[in-house]
Amino acid sequence: AGYVIFFIDKKNNTLWLDYIAIFKEHHSKGFGTRIFEAMKKEFFEFSGVWLEVEKPDENEPDTLRRRKFYKKLGARIVSENYIYPNNNGGLSMDLYFLPFCEENFAKKMHKCVKTAFETIHSDVENIEKIIDKIK
């Protein structure tokens, strides 16, 4: 139905979307949303994903559709003065950020609590049962 290419930035705990393509016959069927849901699930420890987005162009409806899609996912515009580097001096784009942590906060919190409890309170009996009660 499509594919995605992204860069894993472990140093900054984020992803960078390089390219996403959903074949035309699969547009508006939820495949793009499923790709991002899979990324969030796989990389839930990461803060989120950076999206380099073309400026809106009424003559190019796909640019408008992409922007609407990213906003629907929860992406926020971070910079309208972003320059995508290329050998022609750069391309003016907008930079969006789609946070993963808000949606996956409960999972992340549980993982952090588990690590802290197992380290700090390792002397407590049945620590696993206590951890499991925390939602």
Predicted region positions:
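Conserved catalytic-core motifs of GNAT/GCN5-like acyltransferases
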Residues: 52, 65-90
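A short, internal acetyl-CoA/4′-phosphopantetheine-binding micro-motif in the GNAT/acyltransferase core
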Residues: 20-27, 55-57
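Conserved acetyl-CoA-binding loop-helix of GNAT-fold acetyltransferases
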Residues: 22, 28-42
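A generic structural signal for beta-strand entry/edge sites
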Residues: 12-14, 48, 93
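Conserved beta-strand in the GNAT
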Residues: 1-8, 14-21
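Conserved N-terminal glycine/acidic-rich loop preference
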Residues: 13-18, 58-75, 113
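Conserved GNAT acetyl-CoA-binding A-motif
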Residues: 41-61, 65
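C-terminal "cap" of GNAT-fold acetyltransferases
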Residues: 63, 82-134
